[in-house]
């Protein structure tokens, strides 16, 4: 970031869990390994935020495993899962929103599950911080125009989506549809 000061965004992507669950330094305190790991991570993040206080950072949480309220001191948002299938994201986002507000969650429109319409994929991603991971050149003109309008609508509705009250009406776990 020092070499490229124009960087506008930082993603902490750490999808590998600790696999060798032993530390020769902890000796009889092996049960402290995960706690000490997180404390060490936060020390690293303290240094990054001290050096780059205005740099937005996203935590890629690998399925929610590293999302916690302490992390919000450092990260502006969480990426809850690399699974961007919009049907699966309904379940992921439903569960994530039980603990964290919409403004902390990112969801992107992708090409996963092309059997669903661009409208459905966009509607699901608009439930939180909307993004697109999709090649515009691969989209039909009508889908592209729809996305342009959807972004305009999202920007208009963003204060309600990110800061409004969320009411859960129908769980995706109890039926073949959901509503929030």
Protein language model features and the residues they cover:
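Active-site neighborhood of glycoside hydrolase catalytic domains
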Residues: 1-119, 123, 127-144
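Glycan-recognition and catalytic regions of carbohydrate-active enzymes
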Residues: 133-180
């Amino acid at each position: 970031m020092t070499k490229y000061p124009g960087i506008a965004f930082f993603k902490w992507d750490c999808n590998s869990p600790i696999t060798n669950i032993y530390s020769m330094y902890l000796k009889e305190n092996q049960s402290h390994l995960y706690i000490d790991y997180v404390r060490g991570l936060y020390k690293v993040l303290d240094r990054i935020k001290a050096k780059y206080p205005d740099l937005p950072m996203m935590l890629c949480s690998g399925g929610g495993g590293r999302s916690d309220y302490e992390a919000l001191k450092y990260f502006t948002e969480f990426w809850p899962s690399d699974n961007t299938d919009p049907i699966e994201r309904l379940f992921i986002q439903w569960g994530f929103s039980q603990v964290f507000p919409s403004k902390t969650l990112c969801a992107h429109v992708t090409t996963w599950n092309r059997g669903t319409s661009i409208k459905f994929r966009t509607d699901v991603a608009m439930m939180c911080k909307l993004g697109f991971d999709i090649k515009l050149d691969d989209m039909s003109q009508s889908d592209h125009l729809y996305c342009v309008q959807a972004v305009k609508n999202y920007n208009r509705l963003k204060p309600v989506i990110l800061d409004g009250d969320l009411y859960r009406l129908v769980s995706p776990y109890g039926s073949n549809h959901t509503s929030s």
